[in-house]
């Protein structure tokens, strides 16, 4: 009903999500099955690596992390996130709020994480913190 092209057009997906809450659940289910499959392929391919970094949206929400994973929470000011996202083509504030609402509380994510990086959007401080994390877990 909403998707009319392949590869899938982001605007069509956005319209489907905004039109019906059930569509969001269906889309998340489809996308995260694929994410889990790709993640497992990636981990298998890199199983001999000392450290593997994954950046997966809704990792905790979809329970696709393992107990022994080292979680790193990247903390950013909401105003900065919104400012950066609003610069993107086709940014939709309603969609942003919908996705924000399906996420676990930030305090929960912080508590589950072994490390926290305060993202002030400067490369130097982030690299310094990443180096510290790598030294600590190596």
What are these regions (language model features)?
Residues 1-48:
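ATP-dependent small-molecule kinase phosphotransfer cores
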Residues 8, 30-31, 76, 101-104, ...:
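Short beta->alpha linker loops
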Residues 10-11, 24, 36, 78-82, ...:
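A general structural signal for well-ordered alpha-helical segments in protein cores
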Residues 16, 30, 84-85, 99:
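Amphipathic alpha-helical segments that mediate coupling or scaffolding at interfaces
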Residues 27, 53, 117:
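Residue-level signature of catalytic and energy-coupling elements of molecular machines
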Residues 35-39, 47, 66-67, 87-136:
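Small-molecule kinase domains that catalyze NTP-dependent phosphoryl transfer to phosphate-bearing small molecules
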Residues 38-46, 51-88:
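ATP-dependent NMP and nucleoside kinases share a basic, alpha-helical "lid"
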Residues 71-73, 135-138:
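A short, gly/pro- and small-residue-rich
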């Amino acid at each position: 009903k909403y998707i009319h092209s392949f590869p899938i057009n982001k605007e069509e997906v956005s319209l489907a999500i905004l039109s019906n809450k059930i569509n969001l659940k269906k889309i998340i289910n489809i996308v995260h099955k694929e994410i889990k499959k790709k993640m497992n392929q990636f981990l298998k391919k890199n199983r001999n690596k000392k450290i593997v970094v994954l950046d997966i949206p809704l990792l905790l929400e979809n329970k696709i992390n393992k107990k022994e994973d080292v979680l790193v929470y990247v903390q950013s000011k909401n105003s900065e996130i919104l400012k950066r996202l609003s610069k993107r083509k086709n940014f939709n504030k309603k969609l942003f709020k919908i996705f924000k609402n399906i996420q676990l509380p930030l305090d929960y994510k912080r508590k589950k994480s072994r490390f926290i990086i305060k993202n002030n959007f400067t490369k130097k401080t982030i690299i310094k913190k990443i180096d510290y994390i790598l030294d600590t877990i190596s």
